[in-house]
């Protein structure tokens, strides 16, 4: 059985790209959220094995959502995804509990490598 993954990104194109990479590699995408508030609600409902989380989103950003999910489940596995390879953002995300960080545009092998590392 494949691992269940929740994709969080406000850009439909990015969600679609990640979903395509994941499904081709045997992962099951159980949900997609377009903002941080939706991400927290779906995480609690779906209990995925892993979350890919964009940082810059409307309503609630990815780092705030990351902190809220970690408050609900301290062992939650979350990988941050962002076009901003800004050092401060990466440090904030890791300090808040993110397990890894992927910079857009994604390379399929890097996405899979990060997910396998976090799930192992």
Spans of features found by a protein language model:
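Short, conserved "switch-loop" micro-motifs in signal-transduction and mechanochemical regulators
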Residues: 84-85
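Two-component/phosphorelay signaling modules centered on CheY-like receiver
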Residues: 12-31
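C-terminal output helix
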Residues: 88, 106-115
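Receiver (REC) domain active-site loop signature in two-component systems and cognate sites
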Residues: 57
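Acidic catalytic/metal-coordinating carboxylates
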Residues: 35-38, 61-64
């Amino acid at each position: 059985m494949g691992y269940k993954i929740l994709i969080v990104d406000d850009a439909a194109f990015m969600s679609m790209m990640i979903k395509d990479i994941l499904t081709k590699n045997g992962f099951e995408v159980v949900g997609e959220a377009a903002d941080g508030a939706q991400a927290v609600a779906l995480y609690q409902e779906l209990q995925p094995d892993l979350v890919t989380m964009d940082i810059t989103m409307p309503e609630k950003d990815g780092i705030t959502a990351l902190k809220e999910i970690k408050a609900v489940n301290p062992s939650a596995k979350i990988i941050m995804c962002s076009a901003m390879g800004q050092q401060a953002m990466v440090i904030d995300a890791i300090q808040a509990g993110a397990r890894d960080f992927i910079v857009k545009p994604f390379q399929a092998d890097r996405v899979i490598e990060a997910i396998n590392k976090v799930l192992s």
